[in-house]
């Protein structure tokens, strides 16, 4: 059980936001020969002015080939991702103080890839994933402010595709 809460008091006014995310994530791991599988689910709640509850899959499988030289893997999961004023302000220091902060809901994250090691010093990971996201934020100009030098947030539903390639070389033992 994972819980986290935070409260934001912004500026001199009465703007305050309190939210909490509660997570319950039971799962089972199994291993048979070179196959490793995880099957479970994640129940999460996004509690702010009103509470919303989500049920996400949490499954992953990998299979070791050639003594861990190649490990194909795939999975499917979801998550409630916390957005904080500090995180948003680091991305854009010109953010208006009176923004409505919503957590991003990762409804589905399907991913697959191949990782492995060619030697004790050299590892790699190549993967792709497709995310379906609700409340994904974008920065837009704040046309209401007097000198229009601030940004507001707008939230949209998006589908995001990511391609990742990693190569690691570790010199030493």
Residue map of PLM features:
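Surface-exposed extracellular loop regions of Gram-negative outer-membrane beta-barrel proteins
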Residues: 2-6, 15-46, 173
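Alpha-helical repeat-solenoid motif detector
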Residues: 8-10
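Short, contiguous, pocket-lining structural segments
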Residues: 14-20, 51, 159
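Exposed, low-structure sequence patches enriched in small/polar residues
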Residues: 36-38, 44-47, 52-173
């Amino acid at each position: 059980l994972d819980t986290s809460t935070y409260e934001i008091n912004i500026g001199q006014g009465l703007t305050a936001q309190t939210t909490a995310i509660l997570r319950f994530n039971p799962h089972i791991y199994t291993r048979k020969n070179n196959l490793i599988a995880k099957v479970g689910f994640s129940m999460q709640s996004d509690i702010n002015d009103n509470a919303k509850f989500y049920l996400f899959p949490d499954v992953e499988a990998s299979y070791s080939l050639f003594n861990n030289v190649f490990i194909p893997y795939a999975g499917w999961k979801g998550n409630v991702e916390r957005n904080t004023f500090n995180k948003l302000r680091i991305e854009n220091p010109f953010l208006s103080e009176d923004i409505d902060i919503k957590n991003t809901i990762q409804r589905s994250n399907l991913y697959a890839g191949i990782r492995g090691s060619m030697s004790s010093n050299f590892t790699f990971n190549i993967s792709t994933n497709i995310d379906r996201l609700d409340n994904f934020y974008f920065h837009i100009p704040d046309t209401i402010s007097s000198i229009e030098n601030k940004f507001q947030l707008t939230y949209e539903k998006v589908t995001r595709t990511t391609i990742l390639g990693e190569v690691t070389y570790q010199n030493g033992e």
